[in-house]
Amino acid sequence: MIRVAINGFGRIGRNFARCWLGRENTNIELVAVNDTSDPRTNAHLLKYDSMLGKLKNVDITADDNSITVNGKTIKCVSDRNPENLPWKEWEIDLIIEATGVFVSKEGATKHINAGAKKVLITAPGKNEDGTFVMGVNHHDYDHNLHNIISNASCTTNCLAPIAKVLNDKFGIIKGSMTTTHSYTGDQRLLDASHRDLRRARAAAINIVPTSTGAAKAVALVIPELKGKLNGVALRVPTPNVSMVDFVVQVEKRTITEEVNQALKDASEGPLKGILDYSELQLVSSDYQGTDASSIVDANLTLVMGNDLVKVMAWYDNEWGYSQRVLDLAELVAEKWV
């Protein structure tokens, strides 16, 4: 079992903690949290969540220096500079880097300098040792080579399993993606300054077009797709659950039924638990709290001219993604030597 600390107790940090609390027989131990908020505030936000509801059957208390969950003490510290954190003293093995700030190798290395052994970035990284999407390229993780790793983005985690199935089965020539994405904390509640003039506009009353590197990032986990994919995002006035609209030109001629069958087979086989498949007539709120990275909405699959394929898939961009962060952390623990 390895000792884990969370840096940044925001949406992903707290979702990760809840995932960890709910998982049996995990091989990681959550021992510390670094966040700018105080332990009592963080304990309250962990217990009461607008999306996830109240954390039931869990006793949570806090004091000036820790949060206690069912008798288990999680140490708390508050320092914006990772190099000042007591990771060596607390014998921390792995940092879950969830601030969205220290996403570069240079930034994440500050945790290593403070005594941690490895860092898992919960966002697209910059010059990291490796990016891994569970179910797609997680088998490439090498304990001896990969000390600063990225779990990619929630959208890449939704898109990559579908891209893998379509590329393996039909061969992707090129493609584009649009994610209809719930608003996030990076946007403004009311109009206010932002480096992205569209994200500067009120999130809860606008459809906000913005950039995303999620499609290009697929090439980090499926190298043969480098230069073949791109995409955009539409941030919409919902607090959680998003949807990918993926359109590709394929080499092998096909029909809608064959595409859906390939996706269904993958969801029941090699990608079980990562990719899900649904023929139900559902809407976004029905997928709140879904563990899978990607849920194909089979009724929306289209094929035009036997070579233009459109697949749409839901994803819980907080909970589903946090489950994959935990999966990757457990993989790191499994490979620890």
UniProtKB/Swiss-Prot annotation:
Q: In which pathway does it act?
A: Carbohydrate biosynthesis; Calvin cycle
Cross-referenced Pfam families: Gp_dh_C, Gp_dh_N
List the active site: 154 (nucleophile)
Stored InterPro entries: GlycerAld/Erythrose_P_DH (IPR020831), GlycerAld_3-P_DH_AS (IPR020830), GlycerAld_3-P_DH_cat (IPR020829), GlycerAld_3-P_DH_NAD(P)-bd (IPR020828), Glyceraldehyde-3-P_DH_1 (IPR006424), NAD(P)-bd_dom_sf (IPR036291)
Q: What is its EC number?
A: 1.2.1.59
* Entry keywords, A to Z: Calvin cycle, Cytoplasm, NADP, Nucleotide-binding, Oxidoreductase
Annotated NADP(+) binding sites? 11-12, 35, 80, 122, 317
A GO biological process held by the record:
reductive pentose-phosphate cycle
Quick check: keyword Metal-binding in the entry? no
Complex formation: Homotetramer.
Name the family.
Belongs to the glyceraldehyde-3-phosphate dehydrogenase family.
Q: What is this protein called?
A: Glyceraldehyde-3-phosphate dehydrogenase 2
